[in-house]
From Swiss-Prot:
It comes from Homo sapiens. Residues 323-380, 444-464, 754-864, 943-1033 are annotated as: Disordered. The lineage of its organism: Eukaryota, Metazoa, Chordata, Craniata, Vertebrata. Its main location: other. It is found in: Cell projection, Cilium; Nucleus; Cell projection, Stereocilium. Residues 770-784 have a biased composition (Basic residues). This is PDZ domain-containing protein 7. PROSITE patterns: PDZ. GO terms for molecular function: identical protein binding. One of its GO terms (biological process) is establishment of localization in cell. Keywords: Cell projection, Chromosomal rearrangement, Cilium, Deafness, Disease variant, Non-syndromic deafness, Nucleus, Repeat, Retinitis pigmentosa, Usher syndrome. Homodimerizes (via PDZ2 domain). Component of USH2 complex, composed of ADGRV1, PDZD7, USH2A and WHRN. Interacts (via PDZ domains) with WHRN; the interaction is direct. Interacts with USH1G. Interacts with ADGRV1 (via the cytoplasmic region). Interacts with USH2A (via the cytoplasmic region). Interacts with MYO7A (via MyTH4-FERM domains).
Length: 1033
């Protein structure tokens, strides 16, 4: 279920207990092990290992269990979701934050901002409707329940949040559920019918009685576990009874339902509230009903609606097929819902106050995904996420410390059959397959075809469509020679002829791939010479190839060659290569084949096609063919080997959402490397970016439509105001209810960010207000208002101007002593550059001099670079994750690159945009990927770089300089620095170590000295040098 049903066994850390309670209670298992059989315990442990897998850091499994999302929200895998904004919100003097949240992992969703009050601190900080909160004060909200998220958001008066700007908020349209129960009497599992719950159908059945339990504060242990809660649409059930405990002595049995405790009704109470009631009293009066069953897990299927556009006040979805999620968990609810006044099939489900909770650390999440063929007529992408099944956890009603005087064995331990049923009741993980691989059945079918095929078909190449198998792995069947080297053979013209083997770098060992390749060539030539001598002594007819067999072999290999050629070449080049190969097969002439091929295959990655064309060459022409292409292949292979880098397209899976399925294909870049990209390429992302820009201009309709009779099993999904939340403390009174809300028009379940252009004054008025505000508060801010302007190519989820960086995208810096300004790598022309100053904004008490040093001012300049050079030849540093240098700057320019030859770029320039794509307020890795992708795109020539030339900065005062000596910059505040080239930096390019031992460590940038007579301070630590890094392609 969404959160477990009991308080002692929390295998996945999904409960609402504090971390201390979970750590102390997690050692008590759900099923006893003293009297259970060894086979049963082994099976349980094996099932648990298969379910959880090895721990992979502090990530909790989703309480949704197995989730299948169809037509998922745009947060799944979009460019906009990669843009992380830093927002800092402080409570107002009245103690309000001014925003509401929606979602939660119990619904298979993240935490979304659904409402932002006008004039609140959240609105001033730049928080927008549709933002997905991923982190708060260093705590991740990925796979977090709503109760836990609200507890984190209300635990501090100052929130530093990392959000992803999605521009939309989820809402549930339809839901149905199915619960699996453990029948204690008949020792079997019972699956309820859709729409009926055993607790509802048997509400009047069973014997009810009142049980009094007396404990002491020193030895508090009730001796039973509970499951259920209103967040799951279930009551509170007893799932385990300790052998010889207090509950067993008073007649409480497994399968009993707790109807009330100390006057608090349990028919509409959350799991954590029930735990508080049961654990907080020394005298507990329980109302018990015998049901003979308790819930094991629950399946839920939900459908979510997503707004596309607004026409005539009616909300429209992206497509008729809405998002649906199916989860093996317990996240249903039987809470009452308000019905709308407008006839429609949608409703904004309201969620009551969720209880706070926390998750146990150290449990991994198993996510698999597959992509179906996208619909040509729609814009909705389909993805599937499968998460491990979660059996509802138990909460043990006992004290945290051990009690050696009592046995806490389970009553179920006396019945291994029940334990075995529970272990086998977990739904098997679905069988998934990636479309880049072949199943075992397909491999067997291919082997049968190879055995039963013609000799020409037996020689056909078997190729995997992944990058590593395409380039390094051996795709042909090989055998081990006497010296242990692998050789590939193909059957052609009735005789065995050696073909070009796949190079396996992993098995090369101490011998380099180039040396192995050359050795193989020499040994093969020697063996070919001996084979020719022996063939001359034989019959003349054996030397002549059969034309029919050669044509048949060409026809069998033609689809494979064309498939690879289409990935490496243009359409015209593919036709030319096919035409030349066909002419050679029918007419002969190896020179007429090689010369045009070498002209067409003019790049290292294109020369990979020669490996497959070699299989078409007749055995008598192989020697001539190899002598003509051997040197070119060696050079190409060495170039590819030196440029092998990790493809940036293979991003690590994020924790919030499972990966979206793509049909991938290896695509070569201009440097000879390969990247695994979607079959549709980048146009799909561009279309999505245009769609998001259009959606950003939409506004929310005040009139929404909602169904009159919503489905009973729909889990609530309401806007939870974080300001109205107060931790619930239950004694002997019923849980407090929410205050009544005045009737108002229901808002739609999908909320978009409203455009603020009509509400915003002109830029000059904004600047004047910001200056007056900064004077009234007697503090300066760190960024100018230039962030309101965007480059033409920047993709933004909404047209809202970028708020002040100090409150939204910036970070508050702790008050530090002043640092001397960095030396400017400019010549005499730098003094002539006019600095464009905006209203300075900073969260610290500083002087104008400090603001000038922190505020990078300068003139915007457009620089064009040619992409004809092999490498761009620059390295960059900084990024939004850096507290010292949030902007991206050029760190070093390497000789021989395109940047060096242009002469217009210098170290220290700030990169603002590249080929129309904005580089402001982006992470370091995103800036690296953007620059690399722009330089690889040879279709856009030349490359346009918008840089900010730094202006002259005031010299620091002696007091400031001396103050800097006392307080150094911590090492963890160094900006992310990653040069963007693949070639190592020679030693003579590195700076000399500084001689002044009192120079503080800074961001380790390499700048050219200025012509000023004063010596420039060294920008690195005395005992370290900046590590050389590869250049940009």
């Amino acid at each position: 279920m969404a959160q477990g049903f009991a308080v002692g066994f929390d295998p996945l850390g999904l409960g609402d207990l504090s971390s201390g309670s979970l750590s102390s209670l997690s050692s008590r298992g759900h099923l006893g092990s003293d009297s259970g059989s060894t086979a049963t315990r082994y099976l349980l442990r094996k099932q648990q290992r298969l379910l959880n897998g090895p721990p992979r850091g502090i990530r909790a499994s989703s309480p949704m269990g197995r989730v299948i999302l169809i037509n998922s929200p745009i947060e799944a895998n979009s460019d906009e979701s990669d843009i992380i904004h830093s927002v800092r919100v402080e409570k107002s003097p009245a103690g309000r934050l001014g925003f509401s949240v929606r979602g939660g992992s119990e619904h298979g969703l993240g935490i979304f901002v659904s409402k932002v009050e006008e004039g609140s601190s959240a609105e001033r900080a730049g928080l927008c409707v549709g933002d997905k909160i991923t982190e708060v004060n260093g705590l991740s909200l990925e796979s977090t329940t709503m109760g836990s998220a609200v507890k984190v958001l209300t635990s501090s008066s100052r929130l530093h949040m990392m959000v992803r700007r999605m521009g939309r908020v989820p809402g549930i349209k339809f839901s149905k559920e199915k619960t699996t129960w453990v029948d204690v009497v008949n020792r079997r599992l019972v699956v309820e019918k859709c729409g009926s719950t055993p607790s509802d159908t048997s509400s009047e059945d069973g014997v009810r009685r009142i049980v009094h339990l007396y404990t002491t504060s020193d030895d508090f242990c009730l001796g039973f576990n509970i499951r259920g809660g209103k967040e799951f649409g279930l009551g509170i059930y007893v799932s385990k009874v300790d052998h010889g405990g207090l509950a067993e002595e008073n007649g409480i049995k497994v399968g009993d339902q707790v109807l009330a405790a100390n006057g608090v009704r349990f028919d509409d109470i959350s799991h954590s509230q029930a735990v508080e009631v049961l654990k907080g009293q020394t005298h507990i009066m329980l109302t018990i009903k015998e049901t003979g069953r308790y819930p094991a897990y629950k399946e839920m299927v939900s459908e979510y609606c997503w707004l596309d556009r607004l026409s005539n006040g009616v909300l429209q979805q992206l497509s008729p097929a809405s998002e649906s999620s199916s989860s093996v968990s317990s996240c249903a609810s039987s809470a009452p819902y308000s019905s709308g006044s407008l006839p429609s099939d949608r409703m904004d489900i309201c969620l009551g106050q969720e209880e706070p909770g926390s998750r146990g650390p150290g449990w991994g999440r198993a996510d698999t995904a597959m992509q179906t063929e996208p619909d040509a007529g729609g814009r909705v992408e389909t993805w599937c996420s499968v998460r491990p099944t979660v059996i509802l956890r138990d909460t043990a009603i006992r004290s945290d410390g051990p009690h050696p005087g009592r046995r806490l064995d389970s009553a179920l331990s006396e019945s291994p059959k029940t334990a075995l049923l529970l272990a086998l009741s977990r739904p098997r993980p679905p069988i998934t397959r990636s479309q880049s691989y072949l199943t075992l059945w397909e491999e067997k079918q291919q082997r049968k075809k190879e055995k039963s095929g013609s000799p020409g078909e037996k020689g056909a190449l078997q190729r995997s469509k992944t990058l590593m198998n395409l380039f390094f792995k051996g795709g042909r069947q090989g055998r081990l020679a006497r010296d242990g080297r692998r050789e590939a053979w193909t059957l052609d013209s009735g005789s065995l002829a050696k073909t070009y083997p796949r190079l396996d770098i992993e098995k090369a060992g101490g011998v380099g791939p180039v040396q192995k390749f050359v050795t193989w060539r020499l040994r093969r030539d020697q063996e070919r010479g001996r084979a020719l001598l022996s063939a001359r002594s034989g019959s003349p007819s054996s030397q002549l190839p059969n034309v029919d067999e050669q044509v048949q072999a060409w026809e069998s290999r033609r689809p494979l060659i064309q498939d690879l050629a289409q990935r490496l070449l243009t359409d015209d080049e593919v036709l030319a290569v096919t035409r030349h190969c066909s002419r050679y097969v029918h007419e002969g002439g190896i020179e007429d084949l090689v010369r045009p091929l070498l002209a067409i295959l003019d790049r290292p990655e294109k020369l990979l096609l020669l490996q497959d064309i070699r299989s078409v060459v007749a055995p008598t022409d192989l020697g001539r063919f190899d002598s003509m292409v051997m040197l070119v292949e060696l050079e190409a292979f060495e170039a590819l080997k030196s440029r092998a880098v990790r493809p940036p397209a293979l991003r690590p899976a994020r924790q919030d959402t499972p990966p979206k399925r793509h049909l991938i294909t290896p695509v070569p870049d201009s440097r000879g490397g390969f990247y695994l990209l979607p079959v549709n390429g980048f146009p799909e992302e561009e279309d999505n970016g245009e769609l998001r820009e259009r959606l950003g201009a939409l506004k929310v309709s005040p009139s929404a439509s909602a169904p009159r009779h919503p489905h009973k099993g729909i889990p609530p999904l309401q806007d939870v105001p974080v300001d109205a939340f107060t931790p619930l403390r239950i004694a002997c009174t019923p849980p407090p209810q929410l205050p009544p809300v005045a009737p108002r028009p229901l808002r739609p379940n999908w909320l978009l960010t409203e455009p603020l252009s009509r509400e915003h004054p002109p830029q000059s008025q904004i600047r004047g207000r910001a200056q007056s505000r900064s004077r009234s508060r007697s503090r300066s801010r760190s960024r100018s208002s230039r962030g309101q302007g965007k480059s033409p190519g920047r993709r933004s989820p909404s047209p809202v101007p970028t708020p002040a960086p100090s409150m939204t995208n910036g970070r508050y810096h702790k008050p530090r002593k002043a640092r001397p300004p960095l030396p400017r790598p400019l010549d005499g022309e730098a003094a002539k550059v006019g600095a464009k100053q905006g209203p300075s904004e900073s969260g610290t008490e500083g002087t104008a001099k400090e603001a000038a040093m922190k505020n990078p001012s300068g003139e915007l300049k457009t620089v064009t670079l040619s992409k004809m050079k092999q490498s761009l030849g620059i390295s960059i540093s900084g990024g939004i994750e850096s507290k010292v240098q949030p902007m991206v700057k050029i760190e070093k320019i390497f000789p021989g690159g395109a940047a060096f030859l242009s002469g217009a770029l210098q170290a220290g320039f700030e990169l603002v945009a590249v080929d129309g794509e904005n580089l402001e307020q982006v992470t370091h890795q995103r800036a690296v990927d953007t620059i690399r992708r722009a330089y690889r795109n040879k279709a856009r020539e030349p490359m346009e770089l918008v840089v900010r030339v730094p202006g002259p900065s005031p010299r620091p005062s002696p007091s400031d300089s001396s103050a800097l000596t006392d307080g150094g910059l911590p090492a963890d505040h160094l900006p992310a620095h990653q040069p963007l080239d693949a070639a190592p930096v020679p030693a003579h390019w590195l700076p000399e170590p500084p001689t002044n031992p009192q120079t503080p460590p800074t961001d380790a940038r390499l700048l050219q000295p200025t012509p000023s007579p004063a010596p420039s301070p060294a920008l690195q630590t005395p005992d370290s040098k900046p590590a050389p890094s590869p250049r940009i392609p």
